[in-house]
UniProtKB/Swiss-Prot annotation:
One of its GO terms (molecular function) is helicase activity. SMART domains: DEXDc, HELICc. ATP binds at residues 177-184. It is an enzyme of class 3 (hydrolase). This is RNA polymerase-associated protein RapA. It comes from Pseudomonas syringae pv. tomato (strain ATCC BAA-871 / DC3000). Belongs to the SNF2/RAD54 helicase family. RapA subfamily.
Length: 948
């Protein structure tokens, strides 16, 4: 018979017991809506198979009113589908308690119910449950939570920024690192950590259309975040009232959004906690007028609490454009462009003084005067100590200046010069004769930059007359690959057609193992191609990528890059080289550039090399120079006087050198120090590498796979293949693929093999598997024989596992202070707790299984003796629980007081500290302390041990 649901009834979730007591809100057609007031969560279930259990107390049970008074139940009435409890309160007065007024924090002793009902589990499941609780508690307390699980090398400045930003309430910051320093990874880390911690639940990512796929790949591959990509087609096809409400992470192209008012309305109505905007420097703003894109982002920033803007460096932007980004973050603070310019000028001497201190280790009289003017009398003591050679005082002085830096809290900008660790680049140029077939082609937009595409589109050529049979770059490529033998080589060209033709050419003309990578392939096909290229033993020597196809991929295990043609913009050139030129690259980048002589290709090569110096170094001025000289450049590529061409090269080179000199002079070392973390990031890197070396995760996962019937077999070194077995316990186990999946626990292996799942404590498979253990009841009862000569045969020991926890909204971050913890109690026949003398693992080694029928028979015979002993266990464990709660309250109060004091002092000297931050922190403290008061003990598991 189907369940009858009534608004106001109390139910508990079978799969999410941690949500607390639920209240039925509504039954609408086939859907049931349940509110969980303790956590503020709402769930909708299909009516026919809702995973819910009706909460119905019996006479003798002690229940709690939401105002915290208790009553012992004597009678239960059913009034129109709602239960009404009658009984006595602590003063022995007759009271009535409708189920609608039950406390939301009531805990259920399901382990006791199962034990006495004969539902006794295997010893291995009991151990798995205990170990899962232990690991969960440890991870929630870890400072690495949300930082260590990304598929990337841990890099100090990225980790520092991620922790600093993600740990703020509703962060509003500008990420403006130089190219190649990983702004996307920084943003992904912030999103990931905010989602895991509960500080954010819904995230909107706005990007240029051409970067949508790159973001999709990065979020999925690196962070295991399932992002929904929205465009006009998906939006129109959705059956939902508001398509954006159905997703936690939305990836939206700004070009489409700005043209679709209906989509804008839906986006605003959906509600978001965090907005990330990539390429924010393309949002055009002037004091007189802003672009439609800028205005739309501005309106969103007014209603979304957290905002991350990813942008070019301030020096590249220019001061006015930089101000335009800052006013999106805090329009009250950054409201006047003239005032901002004046303020920026005031900070420049301070940054120069810090530069002097860092470079020379001491301060000139002029620098000391500057710092005195900035810090006032309170800085004089520090200055005196610095002059006396006190290194600690020097570090503190820099910290004080950092805190007062005008945009230090909202702007993070790392430079290659400050970060270091980048490889050298070496250029190999190969001028080749231009074939006659190309000389006869009609002139068109970029036709002579990519003559093979133009030739093939004009020709009905047979297989024998394909462009790759006469183009000298193909012959050169084959010779180069043969010379490099088995060295991995990445080839990038502008068009997918060229990439596919080159693969054909290599197969037909040389037999060199190659694979291709272009935008026409789906993600699975790209993964297979990337894996084939990465395989050292049997893989392809060469991977041929189109321009768009390679976005978001990291091939830094290779260090030879062939630029088969050149892109029309320096940013695209930098993007190509950036596939290999990244932090962590251990080899010199060998750049191979073939080009056709006396063609536009030759001139474009000369432009990039001689004018922009874009091959041997990153080119932060490239965009500005292209904008300035582009109108003259394009006509001269096709044709033009040699003297006029050389004049353009010389002029652009001089302008580049001038701009680079300005950039170097304007370097803000104070900001670089703040962005780099001054050593904090390095400590995080060490901790992550240390965690990577531990074996606790593989050992735990092997027991988890065994318990759920997942077969694992060796794939290769450091890799396993997982497949569901015929005895798979739960089809909802998050394996990721019904057919099977290849995993690795090794970070380096995962970086080179993107077709493998990188398993960490944060991975959805691990988290999902642990949730299945703890949300189910398997393993919360066990009976065993204990073989110990010190125990008299027939002696009964009782092992009780309690969970000390607080049920609260995740956004309060109480897991950092009072994570769910297993509190263990081992009672002998006299009621003594032996747990401090006998560890869980020591005890486990002495146990043998008991057949379920025999175990059940024993439990029923001992029920009257076991019940009071189980009740006595809570008295033993309550002091430990109370101690944990008191310590959690102390730490929460101390941490928030310290942060409030720091921010309050900082606000007096740095206006970028918002009042809303302080208010939110105080509110969070009060709510957190109140929730900790309601922390409860829950009997999680019982094991009965009989000496034999």
């Amino acid at each position: 018979m189907a369940q009858q649901y009534q608004p106001g009834q109390r139910w508990i979730s079978d799969s999410e017991a941690e949500l607390g007591l639920g209240t039925v809100l509504a039954q609408d057609g086939r859907l049931l809506t349940v509110l969980y007031p303790a956590t503020g969560e709402t769930r909708q279930y299909a009516l026919r198979n809702a995973p819910l259990t009706r909460v119905r107390f019996s006479p003798g049970d002690v229940i709690t009113h939401f105002e915290n008074w208790k009553m012992t139940v004597r009678e239960v009435d059913d009034v129109d589908g709602l239960l009404v409890y009658h009984g006595l309160n602590a003063q022995n007065e007759v009271v009535t308690l409708p189920e609608t007024q039950l406390s939301n924090f009531i805990q259920f002793r399901l382990a006791t119910d199962r034990l006495f009902a004969g539902q006794i589990d295997q010893l291995s499941w009991f151990s798995l449950r205990y170990n899962t609780l232990e690991h969960t508690s440890r991870q929630l307390q870890s400072s690495l939570w949300g930082l260590g699980g990304v598929r990337a090398q841990p890099i100090a400045h990225q980790l520092h920024i991620a922790r600093e930003v993600a740990d703020r309430i509703a962060p509003r910051v500008l990420l403006a690192d130089e190219v190649g320093l990983g702004k996307t990874i920084e943003a992904g880390l912030v999103i990931h950590r905010q989602l895991l911690s509960g500080r954010a639940n819904r995230v909107l990512i706005l990007v240029p259309e051409n970067l949508q796929h790159q973001w999709l790949v990065e979020m999925r591959r690196r962070f295991n975040l399932q992002v929904a990509l929205f465009d006009a087609e998906r939006f129109m096809e959705s059956d939902a009232g508001n398509p954006f409400e159905d997703t936690q992470l939305a990836l939206v192209a700004l070009e489409w959004l700005v043209e679709d008012e209906k989509a804008q309305d839906a986006l605003f109505a959906a509600g978001w906690d965090l907005m990330v905007v990539d390429e924010a420097h393309h949002l055009v703003w002037h004091e007189e007028k802003a672009s439609r894109e800028y205005s739309l982002v501005e309106q969103l920033a007014e209603v979304i609490a957290g905002v991350l803007l990813l942008t070019a460096t301030p020096e590249q932007l220019g001061q006015d454009s930089h101000f335009a980004r800052l006013r999106l973050l805090d329009p009250n603070r950054f409201h006047d462009l003239k005032a901002f310019r004046a303020e920026s000028e005031n900070y420049r001497p301070v940054a120069q003084a810090v530069q002097e201190l860092l470079d020379k280790g001491k301060l000139s009289a002029a620098a000391q005067k500057t710092i005195h003017g900035f810090l006032g009398a309170e800085g004089d003591t520090l200055l005196a100590a610095v002059n006396a050679g006190d290194d600690e005082a020097k570090a503190r002085l820099i910290r004080e200046l950092l805190d007062r830096h005008g945009t230090g809290r909202v702007l993070f900008r790392n430079t290659r010069a400050a970060v270091q660790g980048f490889p050298e680049r070496k250029l190999h140029q190969y001028p080749l004769p231009c074939p006659v077939e190309y000389l006869e082609l009609p002139v068109g937009e970029h036709a002579d930059l990519y003559p093979e595409v133009s030739f093939q589109s004009q020709s009905d050529a047979s297989e024998e007359e394909r462009w790759w049979r006469f183009d000298p770059r193909v012959e050169w490529l084959i010779d180069t690959l043969k010379m490099l033998k088995r060295v991995k080589v990445l080839v990038i060209c502008a068009h997918a057609e060229t990439a596919m033709d080159l693969e054909d050419a290599l197969r037909v003309r040389s037999g060199i193992p190659a694979t291709v990578f272009h935008e026409g392939m789906n993600i699975l096909e790209r993964d297979r191609a990337a894996a084939y290229f990465a395989d050292e033993e049997f893989g392809a020597q060469v991977l041929i990528c189109s321009e768009i196809g390679s976005e978001g991929r990291n091939f830094q295990f290779s260090h030879h890059l062939v630029l088969f043609d050149l892109p029309s913009h320096p940013d695209l050139l930098e993007q190509r080289i950036g596939r290999l030129d990244r932090i962590g690259q251990k080899h010199v980048i060998e750049l191979h550039v073939p080009f056709l002589e006396t063609s536009p290709q030759a001139r474009l090569f000369q432009w990039y090399h001689e004018a922009l110096n874009a091959f041997l170094n990153t080119c932060p001025t490239g965009n500005a120079l292209q904008h300035q000289f582009g109108p003259r450049l394009l006509p001269l590529l096709e044709s033009g006087d040699d003297d006029e061409w050389q004049s353009l090269i010389d002029e652009a080179r001089s302008e580049r050198e001038r701009l680079e000199s300005e950039l170097h002079t304007g370097r803000d070392r104070l900001l670089e120090l703040n962005s780099g973390g001054a050593g904090e990031g390095e400590a995080l890197v060490e901790d992550i590498l240390e965690q990577d070396d531990q074996f606790s995760l593989p050992i735990y996962m092997e027991t988890l796979f065994d318990a759920f019937g997942i077969d694992s077999e060796d794939h290769s070194e450091n890799a396993l293949i997982l497949k569901p077995s015929e005895k798979m316990l739960d089809a909802s186990f998050p394996l990721g693929d019904d057919e099977g999946v290849t995993i690795t626990y090794d970070r380096n292996q995962a970086l080179s093999r993107e077709d493998m799942q990188f398993i960490t404590w944060e991975h959805p498979m691990v988290q999902g598997g642990m949730d299945l253990v703890l949300s189910g009841s398997m393993g919360n009862t066990a009976v065993a024989l204990i073989k110990n000569k010190a125990l008299k045969p027939g002696t009964v020991l009782l092992e009780l596992i309690y969970v000390s926890e607080v049920v609260a909204p995740r956004s309060l971050q109480l897991g950092r202070y009072l994570p769910p913890a297993a509190l263990r109690c081992l009672l002998d026949a006299n009621g003594n707790d032996l747990s401090s003398r006998v560890s869980f693992n020591t005890l486990n080694d002495q146990l043998e299984s008991v057949p379920r029928a025999s175990a059940n028979k024993f439990i029923q015979a001992q029920r009257d003796q076991l019940t009071p002993r189980i009740n006595a266990g809570e008295e033993k464990i309550t002091p430990k629980h109370a101690e944990r709660v008191a310590e959690a309250q102390r730490r929460l109060a101390a941490d928030t007081e310290e942060e409030l004091a720091r921010l309050t002092a900082l606000q007096a000297v740095n206006p970028t500290v918002r009042d809303s931050e302080l208010v939110a922190l105080r509110t969070q403290r009060e709510q957190g302390l109140a929730m900790l008061e309601k922390a409860a003990l829950r009997l999680e598991a019982i094991r009965v041990l009989v000496a034999g």
